[in-house]
A protein has these predicted regions:
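Ordered, amphipathic secondary-structure segments that act as subunit-interaction surfaces
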Residues: 80-83, 100-101
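Aromatic-lined carbohydrate-recognition surfaces of secreted/lumenal glycan-active proteins
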Residues: 94, 98-106
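Charged catalytic cores and adjacent phosphate/nucleic-acid-binding surfaces used
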Residues: 1-11, 15-17, 21-26, 46-59, ...
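Flexible loop residues that form catalytic
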Residues: 41, 102, 127
């Protein structure tokens, strides 16, 4: 059985999102997904709905000095903006630390070498990343391959049309 998840979506709780959680779930179901991760900027869902046939993963997207970091399966906000501290805080909650769109704003393929061993995965497909760097997703795939890291994909949806644009 194949499961399809969009592991990077923003709700209206993000400063730049506009969709309610119920709208995200409805759209994701219509598009054949089995679940989503709600990765609002620097915050987490106050309550996580449970469905028999659909999974909502509590998550967050943290802005750090090294770029954006997804904390999957976290239920408490991560207050720090320091990359290493944020990874530690995610792990303390039993979450997974995934580097999000690592080359959207930078083409330096070695900029994360010193922290890769602490991460749980690399977002290798982000449907918005190639807008700023046309090679961003290809570079992320190469980073994951080089470090033999698990991978994720997400739409980074901020508007309804984008939901399901990246699927793991």
């Amino acid at each position: 059985m194949e499961l399809r998840f969009d592991l990077h979506i923003h709700s209206e709780q993000s400063f730049d999102g506009c969709m309610s959680l119920s709208e995200i779930v409805r759209l994701a179901r219509e598009r054949g997904l089995n679940g989503v991760a709600i990765c609002d900027h620097d915050r987490v869902l106050e309550s996580v709905p449970e469905y028999d046939d659909f999974l909502v993963i509590p998550a967050t997207e943290i802005s750090t000095e090294r770029g954006h970091l997804l904390g999957l399966f976290v239920r408490e906000p991560i207050e720090t903006r320091q990359f290493s501290e944020a990874v530690t805080a995610i792990h303390a909650q039993g979450g997974l630390a995934v580097i999000a769109h690592p080359f959207e704003h930078s083409k330096d393929e070695h900029r994360l070498d010193d922290v890769m061993s602490r991460l749980d995965g690399v977002e290798i497909w982000n449907s918005r990343a190639d807008r700023k760097n046309k090679n961003a997703n290809a570079m992320a795939r190469e980073l994951a391959r080089k470090w033999e890291m698990p991978v994720t994909a997400g739409s980074d949806a901020h508007v309804p049309e984008e939901v399901g644009g990246g699927v793991t």
